């Protein structure tokens, strides 16, 4: 069964002046048609490669599956070294579709290697990883589209030294590079060393790359059916081609986001009611923030537009964030992820009936409780005039996860068209990169180093 998306709580009368009307959406039909035509043209010209990913050629799928089988047969650990989309996507899909205690399961129950995603350069984190893995039994999947990501390359240098000490000249057998098919230092190094590689299409940005080998190889290594993942994405791709705005999930969701953004809803909270979907909110945070947060529109005019992503988890954050969402500023749109059928059923025993707080729970299940709490939170927010909508999973499986990934990516593409911004670049990230290079003495960044060092801090504003 396919994902359902329930937009009722954007239009409900309870919202009063915070609601959208059907006329608001009808007024977007011309913009939608124009956006759909524009996106189709860019797709046909090969400018937006993520639209093609659900239709990955059979030979590419087979090669990913072959490599995954070899890793599963020969190695005890599989470590992703990457940052941003190179890490968030693999982690989100792994957590969604594998056992939540995956690494703690026995090797027999796992059926594959332990899985780690190292997406930060905190020295304590790297040191702790090296204490729990056996490098000689590990494959490191180094992922960077540009082949020049400083954080990822620093990790590569560290693990390469460790591997050389453990296995000598065979260290290359423990490396897989996922990068640009032609350009970049990582591609050049792979040619020099003879390292196994997978290609990220040049027309696919990092945050849109989960359905490339960036995400498909780690998924296959941990036993996920990547064919079903792609099949779900194809299903959603067809739905997102519909020419009626009211029937196009991505076009309609994007219109809702932009209309509410124009009315002051400058934050978008994603709140899954499933621990398995927790890291989907992390992945989506990059997708929304990096794609839509822009200073300039496509005409070069300053617009400073964006919708700040916020991550929450139901029911955990009912006890930390929901107070703010119900009684704080009217500046948020909430997106719930709901699961109709969880993969496990846990009964709450009917014990200690003399206590009312325990009696009413007995005989129910955790499944019933979490579903009730989601509906209750949804109601409370609606009553407090806070717009929200729900993405409903019949169950969490590779097919529905593939649908979700494509839906969110296509929604972002439509938002970019509606806002007249480039949703596929990230110029605001570049200044920090250049300053990092300068501070570490990279050649060619001497002037930038002087510029950075000119910025002084006043001791009087530093408390000791």
Swiss-Prot record:
Main localization, broad class: cytoplasm
Record EC number: 5.3.1.9
GO biological process: gluconeogenesis; glucose 6-phosphate metabolic process; glycolytic process
Keywords: Cytoplasm, Gluconeogenesis, Glycolysis, Isomerase
GO cellular component terms listed in the entry, alphabetical order: cytosol
InterPro entries: G6P_Isomerase, Phosphoglucose_isomerase_CS, SIS_dom_sf, SIS_PGI_1, SIS_PGI_2
Catalytic activity line of the entry: alpha-D-glucose 6-phosphate = beta-D-fructose 6-phosphate
List of catalytic residues: 290, 319, 433
Gene Ontology molecular function terms on file: carbohydrate derivative binding; glucose-6-phosphate isomerase activity; monosaccharide binding
Cellular location(s): Cytoplasm
Signal sequence annotation: none
Keyword Oxidoreductase set for record: no
Keyword Cell inner membrane: no
Pathway(s) of this molecule: Carbohydrate biosynthesis; gluconeogenesis; Carbohydrate degradation; glycolysis; D-glyceraldehyde 3-phosphate and glycerone phosphate from D-glucose: step 2/4
Stated family: Belongs to the GPI family.
Function, as annotated: Catalyzes the reversible isomerization of glucose-6-phosphate to fructose-6-phosphate.
Protein name: Glucose-6-phosphate isomerase
Organism: Carboxydothermus hydrogenoformans (strain ATCC BAA-161 / DSM 6008 / Z-2901)
Gene designation per UniProt: pgi
């Amino acid at each position: 069964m396919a994902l359902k998306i329930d937009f009722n709580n954007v239009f409900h009368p309870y919202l009063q002046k915070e609601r959208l009307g059907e006329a608001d959406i009808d007024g977007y039909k011309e913009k939608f048609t124009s956006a759909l035509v524009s996106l189709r043209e860019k797709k046909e010209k090969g400018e937006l490669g993520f639209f093609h990913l659900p239709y990955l050629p059979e030979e590419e799928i087979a090669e990913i599956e072959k490599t995954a089988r070899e890793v599963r047969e020969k190695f005890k650990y599989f470590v992703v070294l990457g940052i941003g989309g190179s890490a968030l996507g693999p982690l989100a899909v792994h957590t969604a579709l594998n056992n939540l205690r995956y690494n703690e399961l026995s090797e027999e129950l796992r059926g594959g290697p332990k899985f780690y995603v190292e997406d930060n350069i905190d020295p304590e984190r790297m040191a702790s990883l090296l204490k729990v893995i056996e490098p000689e039994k590990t494959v490191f999947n180094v992922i960077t589209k540009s082949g020049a990501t400083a954080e990822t390359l620093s990790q590569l240098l560290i693990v390469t030294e460790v591997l050389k000490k453990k296995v000598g000249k065979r260290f290359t057998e423990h490396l897989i590079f996922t990068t640009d098919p032609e350009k970049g230092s990582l591609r050049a190094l792979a040619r020099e060393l003879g390292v196994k590689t997978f290609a990220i299409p040049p027309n696919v940005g990092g945050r849109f790359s989960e359905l490339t080998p960036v995400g498909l190889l780690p998924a296959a290594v941990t036993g996920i059916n990547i064919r079903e993942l792609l099949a779900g994405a194809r299903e959603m791709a067809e739905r997102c081609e519909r020419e009626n705005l009211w029937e196009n999930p991505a076009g309609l969701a994007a219109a809702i986001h932009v209309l509410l953004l124009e009315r002051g809803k400058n934050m978008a909270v994603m709140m899954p009611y499933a621990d398995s979907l927790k890291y989907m909110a992390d992945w989506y945070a990059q997708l929304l923030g990096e794609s839509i947060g822009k200073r300039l529109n496509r005409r070069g005019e300053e617009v400073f537009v964006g919708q700040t992503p916020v991550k929450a988890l139901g029911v955990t954050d009912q006890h930390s964030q929901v107070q703010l969402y119900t009684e704080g500023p009217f500046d948020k749109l909430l997106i719930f992820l709901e699961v109709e059928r969880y993969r496990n059923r846990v009964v709450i025993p009917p014990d200690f009936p003399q206590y009312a707080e325990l009696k009413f729970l007995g005989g129910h299940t955790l499944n019933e409780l979490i579903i009730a709490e989601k509906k209750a939170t949804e109601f409370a927010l609606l009553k407090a005039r806070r717009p929200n909508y729900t993405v409903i999973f019949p169950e969490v499986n590779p097919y529905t996860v593939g649908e979700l990934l494509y839906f969110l990516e296509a929604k972002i593409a439509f938002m970019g068209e509606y806002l007249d911004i480039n949703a596929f670049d990230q110029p605001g990230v570049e200044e920090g990169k250049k300053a990092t290079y300068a501070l570490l003495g990279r050649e060619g960044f001497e002037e930038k180093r002087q510029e950075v060092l000119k910025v002084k801090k006043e001791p009087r504003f530093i408390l000791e």
